[in-house]
Amino acid sequence: MRGKFITFEGIDGAGKSTHIDWVADRLRARSDIAGVVTTREPGGTSLGEDLRQILLHRKMHLETEALLMFAARREHIAEVIAPALERGKWVISDRFTDATFAYQGGGRGLATERLEVLEDWVQGGLQPDLTLLFDVPLETASERLAGARAPDRFESESRAFFQRTRDEYLRRAAQSPQRFRVIDATRSIADIRDELEKIIATI
């Protein structure tokens, strides 16, 4: 039986990464699951991690950025995601294609139609079974990022960029309510995990 594919999404500072290992551990405790793989984008493979460093720290044209994102994703799918799903394992990815539509599409303004062509070519019919969108106002995200490590190229973007990115995430969630669950990530970790527990119990 094919495994399930779960993605975590949200703007920088939304707090999604705090919950990935917790959800993975909850799923590993279930007797009906063959195993759980946690991964991330960009990254997840040796080549993907090299591309991640370029994407996070090197200036480039916006179309180059999108193409590199999908190049890393193709490798990620071929080497990690698809094989794990075929073996019946569940895969949890910190970001996937929704992030590209939000950041490169919403944030950068790259045409959705171009991204859809790349999505179809790179992924075929592969889509997450569940996408958890951790949503916070920009003020909350900024407060959480303040004083953290030196910001990368994306974290250094303008407030307007992140507003467009957040708006695109929410637009995609509204378009695909059967796949998305929008999490109010301004709440306490305990409250968020109570909600996550209920969500993962249904899949």
Swiss-Prot record:
Reaction(s) this enzyme catalyzes, per UniProt: dTMP + ATP = dTDP + ADP
Binding-site list for ATP: G10, I11, D12, G13, A14, G15, K16, S17
Key words of the record: ATP-binding, Kinase, Nucleotide biosynthesis, Nucleotide-binding, Transferase
GO biological process: dTDP biosynthetic process; dTTP biosynthetic process; dUDP biosynthetic process
InterPro entries referenced in this protein's UniProt entry, alphabetically: P-loop_NTPase, Thymidylate_kin-like_dom, Thymidylate_kinase
EC top class named in words: transferase
MF (Gene Ontology): ATP binding; dTMP kinase activity
A GO cellular component annotation in the UniProt record: cytosol
Pfam families for this protein: Thymidylate_kin (PF02223)
Origin superkingdom: Bacteria
EC number(s) recorded for this UniProt protein: 2.7.4.9
HAMAP family assigned: Thymidylate_kinase
Family listed: Belongs to the thymidylate kinase family.
Role according to the record: Phosphorylation of dTMP to form dTDP in both de novo and salvage pathways of dTTP synthesis.
Protein name in the entry: Thymidylate kinase
Source species of the chain: Cupriavidus necator (strain ATCC 17699 / DSM 428 / KCTC 22496 / NCIMB 10442 / H16 / Stanier 337)
